[in-house]
Each structure stands twice: as C-alpha cells, then as structure tokens.
Amino acid sequence: MAGHSRWHNIKNKKAKADAIKGRMFTKVIKEITIAARLGGGDPEANPRLRIAIEKAKEVNMPMENVERAIKRGTGELEGVNYEEVQYEGYGPGGVAIVVEATTDNRNRTTAEIRHIFSKYGGNLGSSGCVSFSFEDKGIINVPKDKYSEDEIFEKAIEAGAEDVIMDDPEYYEIRTAPSELYKVRENLEKMGVEIAKAELTKIPTTTVQITDEETATKLMKLLDALEDNDDVQKVYANFDIPESILEKLEG
C-alpha cells in the first residue's frame, strides 16, 4: 500500500496547490481590474497596475488573462464592477484584525466575513474600531545576499525611503511612506538594486502577545479562513506568538 499512500498524498497536495493557485488567480485578476479602472491600462503610467502584473507573473497567470482583466478595468471589455471594502474586528486573545476585500456584492461579502469571525472566536466590529492599531506603509524587499547592511541602507535613504528593517533572515525590508512606494522603487531600480517584492501594507503600531497554544490555534484558523475567502485580498493582524508555540503549530 506504500505506493497507493504516496499517490494519495501527492493527489491531496496537488489538489490543495491547485486550489491555492485558483484563489490566487481570482485575487490577482480583481486587483488588476481595479488598478486599471483607477489608473488606466498602461502599466508604465500606472504603478499599481505594474505591481499587480508582476504578481500575476509570480503565480504563472497566462498573459491573455492579464490582458482581459486590464480591458475589463478600462471598459474595453464588459465585466464585473468590483469595489474595495475594508473590514475591522477582533480575533481570539483580543488581536486586532483588518481585512481588505474586493467584491462585486458588498452584502454577500459582509455576511461571509461576519460568519468567519463568529465561527472562529472573533468579532466583526465597526469601521475604525482597530485601524488605529496599524499604520500604512510601503515595503520593498531586497535579497540580503546581494548587499551589505550599510550598502542597502545608504541606497534606500538616497532613494527616498524612511527606514530599513533587518529582522528577516532572507530579505531587507525597506519602508516608505505609502505615497512614495512607487517612486522609491523606481529610484532603487535606477541604482541597479534587485527587488524581490514591493507592496503597500499595514504595520502594527502595537502587538498583542499570544502565550498559549489554544488561543494561537484559534487565531490561526480564523486568519486562514479569512485568507481563503475569494473576496479577501489581504489580512493584517497585530499578534506576536513565541517561536516555541509557532513550531508546535507548524508541526
């Protein structure tokens, strides 16, 4: 039965990977459509669209899908009218959570997000209830094996960045004001800096310590369920979990 078991495991992993890929396609198509609607269909003149197209390449999306999404955004093709919605609430342990969604039916999405919060021990709140716990930033990831700390810090500041965070083992995290992200990225590219990723994000101003495995497990289930929703683009939370508990959860 060893062969059968191995096949079964591969099938399950492939099904999961395909599902994740399908969800990523949906999320990226929505982002491309909205970016094109708001800033036009030319990626050279629309930095948000350019980054969305790069994300499409990362998930191996066929270019014809990308082009159709752009045309739907610009109105050249008839398509779904998406709107951006933000939800705020609390998770297990009092963790603040912000959910960014893109939807063609706000009522449906709101009901689904509320259900997910309730099912996994959270509580969907009103607009503004937790957003003060985060600040908007642009982040640019640069591989650590390419540059020394001094070198990347000097280049980042010269490019107009606010700071460089060194915590990640693989990447420097260059932080910018949200409005300066695309400009700083372009300045770095002109300097020949290799960029792994650039995106707008929310960074917690304070964190909630989760020190027991049960609460951590509930929180992870809530965050996973939110991210699995087709309308959800990004999920932010201000938790801090000790390495010892994280290792158990991953195990």
From Swiss-Prot:
Keyword Endoplasmic reticulum: no
InterPro entries found in the cross-reference section: Integrase-like_N (IPR017856), TACO1_YebC-like_2nd/3rd_dom (IPR048300), TACO1_YebC_N (IPR049083), Transcrip_reg_TACO1-like (IPR002876), Transcrip_reg_TACO1-like_dom3 (IPR026564), YebC-like (IPR029072)
Transcription recorded as keyword: yes
Major localization listed first in the record, in broad terms: cytoplasm
Single Gene Ontology MF annotation: DNA binding
Gene Ontology CC terms, in alphabetical order: cytosol
Assigned keywords, A-Z: Cytoplasm, DNA-binding, Transcription, Transcription regulation
Annotated GO biological process: regulation of DNA-templated transcription
Record's subcellular location: Cytoplasm
Disulfide links within the chain: none
Any Pfam family matching the protein: Transcrip_reg
Coiled-coil stretches noted in the UniProt entry, renumbered to this chain: none
Alphabetized HAMAP family for the sequence: Transcrip_reg_TACO1
Family named by the database record: Belongs to the TACO1 family.
Name the UniProt record assigns to this protein: Probable transcriptional regulatory protein SYO3AOP1_0685
